[in-house]
Amino acid sequence: MRKKSHVSLSRYLLDHIDSELLENHRKAFIVGSVLPDCKPSFVTTKHNMEETFDMVCEFIRKLTVNSDDYKKISTAYCRKLGEVTHYLADYFTFPHNCVFTGSIREHCIYEKKLKFALRSYIRSGEINVNSTVVRRFTTPQQLCDYVIQIHQQYLKCNKTVESDCRYIVALCHVAVAGILNLLEHYRNSNPVAAAAAA
């Protein structure tokens, strides 16, 4: 996805996920959502499931279970959460998948169309997110398994910018809400850490 698409997505997530943490660190979350495209590794590491999913699952673990120092849950935390959305969104962008056989030029043309389609989809108010699944995650691994399951579903569907929009928005919404829910769960199960964060 293009940087502007990642910004549009991050703004949607900020506006539709009820989180004081995100609200207090909006800019960090938005910056995080474009950061992977600004790193030198962008040239050598493809943003696809095969090359980066293990890293993303590790990020998810650190954003939930391994967040021992709750005083640091702030700007850096939200920036890293934004990075997670970047990779997840790219996994559901057709040219970032092994089923795409087009050229770099076709990749760029597709992402340009996706930029406009995503903006239009977000503004349409026709977004359908299964928020009930968020509460089912009791471990970071369950969330990662869910991403794999939805990605397998995605690979079987017709690849259009419209289907990409639906998958990207719904999956990223569930993932961010799921990460924040897991964080809250682990904070509540560790009263000492929760008191330190207050």
Question: What residue spans do the PLM features occupy?
Answer:
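N-terminal leader/auxiliary helical segments
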Residues: M1-E83, L88-A198
